[in-house]
Amino acid sequence: MCGIFSLLNYSTNKIEYTKVSDEFAKGQGRGPENSTLFHDNALNIVTGFHRLAINGLNEVSNQPISVVAGADRYSLICNGEIYNYKQLYKLMDVTPTTDSDCEIIIHLYIRYGIRQTLRMLDGVFAFVLFCPNNIFVARDPYGVRPLYYTKNDEDHNKVNGIIGFTSELKTLCKIANQFNQKVLQFTPGTFLTIDKTIDFERILWLIKEQERYHIPAFASSVNENVNENISSYLEGINYHLRAAVTKRYTTTERPIACLLSGGLDSSLIAAIVCDIHKKQNLAPIETYSIGLPDSEDIKFARMVARHIGSNHTEIIVSEQEMLDIIPEVIQAIESYDTTTVRASIGNYLIGKYIKAHSSAKVIFNGDGSDELAGGYLYMSSCPDSVEYDKETMRLLNDIHLFDVLRSDKSISSHGLEPRTPFLDRGFVNYYLSIPIELR
């Protein structure tokens, strides 16, 4: 897990580097292994990166990553994992200059442009790409990786301001307040182009017009013969989910663990991870569950762990411990939403435990399936399949505000990287292509 930070200053005032450095440091929990902050005095741009190394564990792979092509230099900061980077290098016959999977973004852009680059990436990401004439900002389709930006108050003088991008809301708040700005979520599945040659007022208009590159591929009509292909759909679900887990398992150089609540979602993911892991003849994968004494979740997680043969740890907490940790949780997830805070407490405490007692850095979870597959209890009350489909679309479009925010920040705040196979682009696209009646 990593954290990105960038400020483009269009103010008449110079950026005070020391103050910016203090704010940037607030996001270090996401990337405790290396932090860099660069200030380009000529362009009045600040670029920062907190790194948790998952691939390319050497200093050469630290960010920002720069690539020179002819007379032009391209630089990138990216919080993400690109699962198909090796296949893309082979396709383009390009040799990378680092071992970072994110470097592929630069090479794709140089050859294909930004739109095609975003279509070809299989992964989760939030990045800022600095090119000779433009700056591009983009976020993955479902907002698995967080990204915020500054927005001017409509009544404020538009000429005096900054544009800021960050993985952590807390790193931009004071800076934005100085310029009477708001800090908002960058819309998932979109990108922004900033032309370096145009004025700030025009740039502000462009920021409002983020361009969408991804729209969920929902089934478009009711299928009258839904029962004829049930077995093929089940095979397809199995294939695509296993593929989603496999690519996330193989794209890491750090130890892996799984969250295991005892529910169907996390149990499926943990079972697939264990199945892949056993074929490597390695020690059993670590799984973790948390709950109150005599919790039903703890009991079911124990049963699943025994069945899949994992090295299981149960973290038993009291109600008071859960209440006491709430201020820390709110600080970590950067949300006061009651449901999100409540749901984050367990993940936050597990992340804290793993950081202290395990070498695991990549943490699999079962998040995203309830939104995708209608797992919430109220979904059974949908009047018809069309309304069910509409509600699923709403949940997926908003998932970055709630469950994905929770699953990322409650884990990443401890210097760990969560991985969410149920929100794999290929798996989601396949699942949503299944007739509504079967979903």
Identify the role of each PLM range.
Residues 8-15, 111, 133-136, 144-147, ...:
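ATP-dependent adenylate-handling active sites, centered on carboxylate activation for C-N bond formation
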Residues 91-97, 112-116, 173-183, 336-339, ...:
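Short, polar/flexible loop-turn hinges at active-site or ligand-entry regions and domain interfaces
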